[in-house]
């Protein structure tokens, strides 16, 4: 998120005593906890294969996926995924959604699963790209973590999907007032962020 810090700061002004817990993983791994009421809501990327009929889905924003490398790598024009079979990759761990599609796309381009490290940690992804010369595919909005300019987008001829982000919560449980405000702030700040990118 490029707007997370502003959103949480505003939320804590409105609800200074609210307890906030944040977890990092793919949306698909949070769905059971949302369905049984252990989580108030989650924000993540949607995919057509997710069964969400029993959930409220509030679309937030879209972000195109891009091929990302360390700035230390030289970039000489566009490339293809098939020309990157010898590279080491790091990708988010998931069994559904865009990253599963991306994993299939990489394998269709003869990138071996043995060359792909999978993790739920975005910090680990950034670390491997920055310090071990790995490649990754992430939403464009995530290429400058913590204000860093250490990552570059490698132009790729292959078509990569667009990530559709949404807030998701159960229809079977009444969403808490504080959680509802946080979802509204996510809508507000993601809209402002989208306008800034235009």
Task: Please report, for each region that a protein language model flagged, where it lies by residue.
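C-terminal effector-binding regulatory domain of bacterial HTH transcription factors
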Residues: 14-15, 100, 140-148, 158-198
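Alpha-helical segments flanking ligand/cofactor-binding loops in enzyme cores
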Residues: 31-32, 58, 82, 126-127, ...
């Amino acid at each position: 998120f490029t707007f997370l810090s502003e959103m949480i700061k505003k939320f804590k002004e409105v609800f200074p005593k609210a307890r906030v817990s944040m977890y990092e993983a793919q949306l698909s791994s949070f769905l059971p906890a949302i369905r049984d009421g252990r989580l108030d809501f989650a924000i993540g990327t949607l995919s057509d294969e997710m069964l969400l009929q029993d959930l409220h889905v509030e679309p937030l924003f879209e972000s195109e996926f891009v091929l990302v490398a360390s700035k230390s790598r030289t970039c000489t024009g566009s490339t293809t995924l098939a020309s990157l079979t010898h590279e080491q990759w790091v990708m988010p761990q998931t069994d559904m959604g865009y990253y599963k599609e991306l994993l299939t796309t990489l394998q269709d381009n003869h990138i071996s699963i043995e060359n792909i490290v999978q993790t739920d940690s975005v910090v680990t992804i950034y670390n491997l790209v920055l310090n071990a010369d790995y490649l990754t595919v992430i939403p464009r909005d995530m290429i400058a973590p913590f204000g860093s300019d250490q990552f570059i987008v490698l132009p790729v001829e292959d078509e990569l999907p667009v990530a559709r982000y949404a807030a998701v919560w159960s229809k079977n449980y009444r969403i808490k007032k504080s959680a509802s405000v946080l979802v509204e702030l996510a809508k507000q700040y993601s809209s402002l962020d989208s306008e800034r990118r235009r």
